[in-house]
Amino acid sequence: MKKMFSGVFLAFILILTSSTSYAATIQIKVDGKTIVTDANPEIKNNRTMVPLRVISENVGATVHWSDSQVTLTKNDMKVILKLKSNKVVKNGKTEYLDVKPYMKNNRTFVPMRFIAETFGSHVDYKNGIVSIGTKPFTIDGVIVSALQQEYHLFMGGVVEQSKGNGYNEAIYNTFVENKGSKVKAPANYTWDFHNVSAGDYYKNVQFDFLDQEGNSIKRFDLYSLRGLEQLEILLHEPTEGQWYLFSENAQQSIYQLLDRASMNGFVTVISNTAP
């Protein structure tokens, strides 16, 4: 009886470990950068499962939730997944996953290779490291080498560059998709912190998408109204000479994407003259 119990117990353990195991020793690298995540990847049925945000952000896909259904979009690709279902719809065509997406500790786990390759990235596994190479981000057919952001402070300023393709594309799309109504140029606007007055618009940050030679492909400047109770943000496109209303939520989304890009090692400080 004791031997029988031991055999049954061992078989039970083998079943558990073969279906799901923690991939604690596995590192995920995107374009050479080690990705930080608050939930460990898991191996389930020989598939690497990762938190949805880890993979979606790094391949530049936008996520939309509706009940237990998640929709990922990027350019002309649209993918619909459901929790606890192996059915997936890609641009209207049904396919089937080897492993169903699932929720664990308030994180949605999805098959990493499927999501990465669907959105144009290639995946390689070697020596406990999963390497994802993302598809280059382009604007009007020109490859974006970096997103440069420049801030002027009370004393000095900071210039940084982000080279994460997925993050840069998500930031660009946030600008494009959240343009409000066209407005006239403000009567007074400045980037000089010492000469801004109540009612003036101050440039908070300048975003410049650069090509491989460091030339500007597209630039966006964000201005905010100073010294008055109402919060108003304007988006300026210098090349077109056009101004738009822009939302605080969209601005915060951009800053959050930059924070996560920095956390994952994609942001480099080019210069910092602040004391």
Where do the model's predicted regions map?
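Primary recognition of N-terminal secretory signal peptides and signal-anchoring hydrophobic helices
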Residues: 4-7, 15-188, 202, 216, ...
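Extracytosolic low-complexity repeat regions of secreted or lipid-anchored proteins
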Residues: 206-256
